[in-house]
């Protein structure tokens, strides 16, 4: 079957930005002008095509990366609309991994905002060529050139305006195309009646100045163009287009466009620029991977190459599990068997679909360069490679950040227990940043994610999609107890109730153990003062007491106990009596050994613009944190600190507030350390009050 579009005429692009810059509205207009939809859907009305989840339509934000196919000027354009909220970073991350080009949308009023920097860094990580659409030029305070300056200064981008707005705020009437040296005036509200004309006289000199700057910038991308520019003093429209495209593909040049998606101005020119300047799959370097023998290999984007694809998203669907794939090489046929080389298993392809948000078109095959979805994959998850069985390869996978916040979830009824289990498995399959674990001590189910909004949305989905009723609480910190000195302990259990009595007597020496040893027991009973059959029960009594602690009910760790003496009764002694005596001796010993409470310390790394460094360090200190290192590179500060886990709840929200959303942090367990006396007293008293 022939390709509907040659590979050179395919564009896989993402639309990414800070929350509220107008990404989804821009996508909606692209679909309207390219004929996918015949009525414009607005985000604030809850009618956007790409916002297909109930939560997205209610909140007016995009949570999941919706994939849509459309066409423009005889080119196939596959678009992914990504979320701008920092809690959904994984959605942006997975989009960047499978795209060839990005339209970064900036607000003409807000300019370079926090999440824009995060998205820009993600695009840098995967070397994705990009262009910028400065949106919302109709808003009060809109300033195209101010945003241009911020992109150059804050993102260190080699940005070049290829358009200028005619008017701004309420007077935005058209756009100057500096490449074609023409003006486009919008004659109706829908943006479908556009008049091409000469540049307005009052803007002619400004446009000429910016066009000259553009020529100079573009000429620097190519030696041949430099010669042409020096020889003729200018470049033709075709030379400019060629130079801009070369500059974008070499990741050096970022063309700037402007308009207002909401007011239907400038979107068709954005589509023209996607076709003219963003890369086709054949323009980007071949995907890299590893062969079974460990050798590195590449797969060029070509239908005749062996089949390889990356699963970049898994989604529960009324018709079954949808696995989104980016085709890198070869052809994938409906009904075929493929290998998941990441897990070394075979999978069957039941059906193939191309998506238009929540609408879908079934196809018989997907080809190199396509974005599509597969039904029928049972064990494939995000980041897995699918390939031909004859020539396996494992492609570079996704960078998946560690979750930073966790809460406990408790089903309200027994009936909810099973539903909760199914919901958690399904949600964890879809979202690799969502983790589920069981706290062995509290027996609570703990869910972890990228932020409070992330977990809020997931809990909301449990309720709506899986009909689970659950109580959501704050997670409990897993404290520990230990001892700081040595002493003796003694326990004597003697009971006489009529007939046979109970008797057990144990004497122990107790001392701090080596870090990481937990509970260590040594038997030094000599001369049969305690028969062998009672040693084990005595040790078990101590171990059980160790597990439930003495101070505040937390496990006692790193303690060495030596049983040195004791006594027994021929008739009344029993295993139970010695188990109780062992426990009594252990409690007696701990009280004399300076017991202390330990808390989990976390290694925390915060990355933030330099301006916020003082606030970050002050806040970490107020959380009982110890700053262990800091560095500044290119205006970005990094702070390494050790902070008690108990003080880190709510930190994601606090950091966002302190840094206007521009700070990011990672956190992992480091070790246990002693809790300061005043804090320990409060914890002990609270726990003793609860018991």
From Swiss-Prot:
Pfam families on file: EFG_C (PF00679), EFG_III (PF14492), EFG_IV (PF03764), GTP_EFTU (PF00009), GTP_EFTU_D2 (PF03144)
GO molecular function term, any single one: GTPase activity
Gene Ontology cellular-component annotations: cytoplasm
Domain tr-type G: 8-282
Places the protein is found: Cytoplasm
Parts of the chain that traverse the membrane: none
SMART domains hit by this protein: EFG_C (SM00838), EFG_IV (SM00889)
Domain of life assignment: Bacteria
Residues binding GTP, per UniProt: 17-24, 81-85, 135-138
This protein's UniProt keywords: Cytoplasm, Elongation factor, GTP-binding, Nucleotide-binding, Protein biosynthesis
GO BP of this protein: ribosome disassembly
Family: Belongs to the TRAFAC class translation factor GTPase superfamily. Classic translation factor GTPase family. EF-G/EF-2 subfamily.
Function, as annotated: Catalyzes the GTP-dependent ribosomal translocation step during translation elongation. During this step, the ribosome changes from the pre-translocational (PRE) to the post-translocational (POST) state as the newly formed A-site-bound peptidyl-tRNA and P-site-bound deacylated tRNA move to the P and E sites, respectively. Catalyzes the coordinated movement of the two tRNA molecules, the mRNA and conformational changes in the ribosome.
Protein name as it appears in the record: Elongation factor G
Organism name: Prochlorococcus marinus (strain MIT 9211)
């Amino acid at each position: 079957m022939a390709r509907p579009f040659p590979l050179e005429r395919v564009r896989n692009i993402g639309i990414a930005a800070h929350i509220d810059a107008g990404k989804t509205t821009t996508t909606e207009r692209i679909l309207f002008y390219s004929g996918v939809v015949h009525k414009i859907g607005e985000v604030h009305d809850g009618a956007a095509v790409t916002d297909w989840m109930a939560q997205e339509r209610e909140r007016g934000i995009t949570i999941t990366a919706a994939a849509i196919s459309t066409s423009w000027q005889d080119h196939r354009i596959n678009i992914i609309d990504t979320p701008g909220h920092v809690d959904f970073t994984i959605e942006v991350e997975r989009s960047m991994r499978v795209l060839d080009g990005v339209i970064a949308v900036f607000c003409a009023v807000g300019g370079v905002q926090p999440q824009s920097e995060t998205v820009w860094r993600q695009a840098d990580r995967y070397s994705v060529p990009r262009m910028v659409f400065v949106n919302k030029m109709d808003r009060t305070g809109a300033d195209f050139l101010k945003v241009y300056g911020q992109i150059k200064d804050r993102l260190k981008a080699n940005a070049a305006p290829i358009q200028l707005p005619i008017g701004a705020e309420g007077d935005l009437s058209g756009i100057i195309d500096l490449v074609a040296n023409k003006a486009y005036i919008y004659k109706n509200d829908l943006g479908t009646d556009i008049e091409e004309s000469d540049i307005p006289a009052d803007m002619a000199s400004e446009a000429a100045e910016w066009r000259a700057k553009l020529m100079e910038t573009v000429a620097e991308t190519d030696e041949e163009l430099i010669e042409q520019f020096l020889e003729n003093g200018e470049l033709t429209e075709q030379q400019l287009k060629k130079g801009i495209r070369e500059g974008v593909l070499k990741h050096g040049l970022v063309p700037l466009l402007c308009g207002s998606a909401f007011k239907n101005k400038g979107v068709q020119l954005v589509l023209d620029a996607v076709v003219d300047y963003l890369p086709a799959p054949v323009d980007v370097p071949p995907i890299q991977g590893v062969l079974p023998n460990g050798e590195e290999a590449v797969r060029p984007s070509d239908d005749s190459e062996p089949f390889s694809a990356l699963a970049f998203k898994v989604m529960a669907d009324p018709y079954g599990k949808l696995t989104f794939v980016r085709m890198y090489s070869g052809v994938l046929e409906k009904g075929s068997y493929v290998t998941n080389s990441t897990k070394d298993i075979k999978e069957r392809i039941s059906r193939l679909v191309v998506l238009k948000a929540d609408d879908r078109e079934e196809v018989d095959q997907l080809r190199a360069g396509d974005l599509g979805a597969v039904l029928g994959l049972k064990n494939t998850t995000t980041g897995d490679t699918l390939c031909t069985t004859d020539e396996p390869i494992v492609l570079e996978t996704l960078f998946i950040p560690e979750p930073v916040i966790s809460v406990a979830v408790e089903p309200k009824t027994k009936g909810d227990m099973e539903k909760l289990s199914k919901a958690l498995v399904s949600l964890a399959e879809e979202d690799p940043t969502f983790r589920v674990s069981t706290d062995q001590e509290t027996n609570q189910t703990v869910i972890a994610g990228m932020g409070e909004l992330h977990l809020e949305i997931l809990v909301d989905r449990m309720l709506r999609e899986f009909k689970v009723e659950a109580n959501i609480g704050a997670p409990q910190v897993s404290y520990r107890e230990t001892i700081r000195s040595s002493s003796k302990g003694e326990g004597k259990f003697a009971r006489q109730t009529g007939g046979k009595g109970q008797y057990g007597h144990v004497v122990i020496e107790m001392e701090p153990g080596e870090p990481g040893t937990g509970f260590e027991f040594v038997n030094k009973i000599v001369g049969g003062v305690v028969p062998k059959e009672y040693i084990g029960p005595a040790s078990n009594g101590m171990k059980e007491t160790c597990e439930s602690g003495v101070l505040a009910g937390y496990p006692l760790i790193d303690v060495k106990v030596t049983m040195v003496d004791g006594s027994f009764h021929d008739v009344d002694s029993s295993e139970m009596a010695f188990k109780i005596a062992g426990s009594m001796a252990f409690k007696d010993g701990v009280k004399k050994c300076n017991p202390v409470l330990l808390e989990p310390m976390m290694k925390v790394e915060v990355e933030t613009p330099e301006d916020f460094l003082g606030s970050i360090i002050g806040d970490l200190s107020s959380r009982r944190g110890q700053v262990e290192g800091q560095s500044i590179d290119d205006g970005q500060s990094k702070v390494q600190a050790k902070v008690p886990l108990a003080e880190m709840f709510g930190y994601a929200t606090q950091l966002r507030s302190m840094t206007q959303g521009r700070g990011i942090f990672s956190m992992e367990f480091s070790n246990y350390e002693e809790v300061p006396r005043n804090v320990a007293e409060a914890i002990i008293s609270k726990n003793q009050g609860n018991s």
